[in-house]
């Protein structure tokens, strides 16, 4: 408890300058030099100030932060002018925007005709085999040519 009280009374800048992990990061140690010496480089440049004995400050009028309007203001219409008036005829049916009288053309689906393949079997030369591709059925037809 005695060490904490004694450590708390030490100023913070003295404490940070004495601890190397903090002091060299936060405080740049440089030698004291006057700012008006032209031979010593100094990181901060002072602004030259011209002093006149009888110079008057310009007296500016305090103006608001918004710009004044450039022309005459146009009147705003009242809110009732913008509102949509109610419909007068509630009994009549509304005309739809879409033309429902137009005929709807059905979409044509392309039909595939069955392809007939004629295959000659060497064992039975007198018979032809006809097959339909979609149904894959075989039909034997006897020919008159021998």
Swiss-Prot record:
The modification Phosphoserine is found at residue 143. It is found in: Secreted. Its main location: secreted. Glycans are attached at residues 107, 112, 118. Mammary gland specific. Secreted in milk. The record marks 80-81 as: Cleavage. The keyword Phosphoprotein applies. One of its GO terms (cellular component) is extracellular space. Keywords: Glycoprotein, Milk protein, Phosphoprotein, Secreted. It comes from the Eukaryota. GO terms for biological process: lactation; protein stabilization. Belongs to the kappa-casein family. Kappa-casein stabilizes micelle formation, preventing casein precipitation in milk. PANTHER family: KAPPA CASEIN (PTHR11470), KAPPA-CASEIN (PTHR11470:SF2). This is Kappa-casein. The lineage of its organism: Eukaryota, Metazoa, Chordata, Craniata, Vertebrata. The gene is CSN3.
């Amino acid at each position: 408890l005695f060490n904490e009280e004694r450590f708390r009374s030490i100023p913070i800048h003295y404490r940070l300058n004495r601890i190397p992990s903090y002091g060299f990061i936060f405080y740049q140690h440089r030698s004291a030099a006057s700012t008006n010496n032209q031979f010593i480089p100094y990181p901060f440049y002072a602004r030259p100030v011209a002093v006149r004995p009888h110079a008057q400050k310009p007296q500016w009028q305090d103006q608001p932060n918004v710009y004044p309007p450039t022309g005459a203001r146009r009147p705003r219409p009242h809110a009732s002018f913008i509102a949509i008036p109610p419909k007068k005829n509630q009994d009549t049916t509304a005309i739809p925007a879409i033309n429902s009288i137009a005929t709807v053309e059905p979409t044509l689906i392309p039909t595939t005709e069955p392809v007939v393949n004629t295959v000659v079997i060497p064992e039975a030369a007198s018979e032809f085999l006809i097959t339909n591709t979609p149904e894959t059925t075989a039909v034997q037809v006897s020919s008159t040519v021998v």
